[in-house]
Structures are given as structure tokens and as C-alpha cells.
């Protein structure tokens, strides 16, 4: 899992690369997707995570960005933090009602553009752009 982020974490594109924080967008376009506090993000990038959820609330997207704890996911953000010490937030739709924790189309042939929701992408995109734009 996460071979690209593990490689980049060990061998960054610029020697000694650092960033204030990172944002991982994973499965952020699904219909009726909601985004809870991911456990590893909360543990290692809590300040950045709070900025994101606060911006979503400010923009009127609190129905997408739920201020409650969600699951823990081993994903690229873990290795960005582990190898580069860059706090990284995973914005991910984690479905507690699913056997896998993810959308039923996850890793199937049905994981296609027909299952992407423009409103969800807009909520996530505008939130992330707001956070980036407001960084000093």
C-alpha cells in the first residue's frame, strides 16, 4: 500500500523538502459523501484538520464535513507524516455502514465518473482552496 508516498517520503522531489501541512484527497467525489475526523490525521495533524473543517463550516459545507470522529485509515498521509514529518490530513469518505468502510463502488468496475457528484466535489474543492488561499 501507498508505495508512491513511501518512496516520496524517503526521496523527496527537493532535498530536505518541508511543508506546513498536507491535504490528501481520497474518494472525495462520491454521492452523499461525508467526511469525519480521520483518527491518524487527528493525532498528527489536528491543527490543520481543524482549519479545514472550520473553513468548510464557514463556506456552508458542514453537512459534508462532520465535526465528529470517524475511522482510522492507513493511507498516504501516514507515510508523508512518518518519513517527512509533515502533518497531513486525509479527507476521506469512510462509511461505517459498509463491510469495507468505503463506498460500494470502491475498487470495482463501477468506480467510474457516473458515480461522481459535482456538489460533493464543489464542497471539497472550495473548502481546500479556501484553506490554501488563507494560509499566511
Located regions from the model:
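Acidic/histidine-rich catalytic neighborhood of metal-dependent amide-processing enzymes
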Residues: 1-47
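Stable alpha-helical elements in mature extracytoplasmic
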Residues: 1-8, 48-52, 76, 124-127
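Sec-exported extracytoplasmic/periplasmic mature domains
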Residues: 10-14, 54-57, 61, 82-85, ...
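Hydrophobic anchor at the start of a short beta-strand
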Residues: 20, 63, 88-89
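Short C-terminal domain-edge/linker segments immediately following a structured domain
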Residues: 23, 52-58, 120-127
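Short amphipathic alpha-helical segments, especially helix-boundary/capping motifs
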Residues: 25-30, 51-55, 101-106
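Active-site-adjacent mobile loop/cap segments within catalytic or ligand-binding domains
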Residues: 33-38, 46, 67-136
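Acidic, glycine-rich loop-and-strand cores that form catalytic or ligand-binding grooves
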Residues: 43-65
Amino acid at each position: 500500500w501507498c508505495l508512491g508516498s513511501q518512496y516520496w517520503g524517503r526521496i523527496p522531489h527537493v532535498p530536505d523538502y518541508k511543508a506546513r501541512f498536507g491535504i490528501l484527497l481520497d474518494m472525495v467525489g462520491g454521492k452523499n459523501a461525508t467526511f469525519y475526523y480521520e483518527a491518524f490525521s487527528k493525532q498528527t495533524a489536528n491543527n490543520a484538520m481543524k482549519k479545514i473543517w472550520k473553513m468548510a463550516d464557514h463556506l456552508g459545507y458542514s453537512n459534508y464535513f462532520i465535526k465528529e470522529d470517524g475511522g482510522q485509515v492507513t493511507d498516504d498521509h501516514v507515510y508523508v507524516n512518518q518519513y517527512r514529518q509533515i502533518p497531513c490530513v486525509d479527507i476521506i469518505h469512510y462509511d461505517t455502514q459498509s463491510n469495507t468502510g468505503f463506498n460500494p463502488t470502491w475498487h470495482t468496475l463501477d468506480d467510474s465518473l457516473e458515480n461522481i457528484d459535482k456538489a460533493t466535489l464543489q464542497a471539497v474543492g472550495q473548502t481546500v482552496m479556501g484553506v490554501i488561499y488563507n494560509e499566511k
